[in-house]
Amino acid sequence: MNIIHVKNYEEMSQKAAALLFERIQQSPKITLGLATGGTPENTYTALIAKAKENGQSFSHVQTFNLDEYVGLPAEDKNSYRHYMEQRLFDHIDIPKEKTHLPNGMAPSLEEECRAYENMIADAGGIDIQLLGIGSNGHIGFNEPGTPFSSKTHVVELAEETRKANARYFPTLEDVPKQAITMGIQTIMEAKEILLLISGKAKAEAFAKLCSDEVTEAFPASILNKHPNVTVIADEEAASVYTQKAHL
Ligand SMILES: N[C@@H]1[C@@H](O)[C@H](O)[C@@H](COP(=O)(O)O)O[C@@H]1O
């Protein structure tokens, strides 16, 4: 893993946007894997700003998001489809039909998972996958204990994850109990991975990630086995790791 240490959230976002922008500029055709949550928000803002400054078109880009809640229609303001439209898709010239998220309203969720996996394969795989991390090490919605061999599947969300995401919903009860997520193997098949880690709440997770122990109990640990991962971590996220390193 190539680890880039930055000062804070803003510097992390700028660096991440610059890296993504470079890949978008340099490729005649590119497939991005995208993430939601608080972590990548300013990366998207910075990416839009770069596109505007440079007159860069996104018409050659297609995207696949990591995950989507089950039971929320696309128009629901808490759906990840809505999140992506508000924060990125509506501000760049990417054709809407080239933006993909799992459909959490599909009549057969199992069928939807298979179709999503096939669509990624038909697109030739993901060139660069943007990732955040849960404090319990989850990536996408792959909670601890998820097999490393998993493909896109339906998950029951851990209570910890529902609580962490409750800040976006009126009450904890409104947070969906299930989601569709790319599997860990799906994520590992991306040619390149960009993991962003910011803030004190992620400090233990970052330290664990750097401990080199690869275990299904900490899903992100598998990233140690991927040949092309860049991690951008800010000072707060790196604080526990830095302390341990100096002991
Ligand atoms: N499914 C998402 C993940 O894709 C995200 O990386 C993670 C961290 O979220 P945040 O960036 O808000 O801390 O939790 C959510 O549950």
From Swiss-Prot:
GO terms for cellular component: cytoplasm. One of its GO terms (biological process) is N-acetylneuraminate catabolic process. InterPro entries: Glc/Gal-6P_isomerase (IPR006148), Glucosamine6P_isomerase (IPR004547), Glucosamine6P_isomerase_CS (IPR018321), NagB/RpiA_transferase-like (IPR037171). It is an enzyme of class 3 (hydrolase). It catalyses: alpha-D-glucosamine 6-phosphate + H2O = beta-D-fructose 6-phosphate + NH4(+). Pathway: Amino-sugar metabolism; N-acetylneuraminate degradation; D-fructose 6-phosphate from N-acetylneuraminate: step 5/5. Its EC number is 3.5.99.6. Belongs to the glucosamine/galactosamine-6-phosphate isomerase family. NagB subfamily. This is Glucosamine-6-phosphate deaminase.
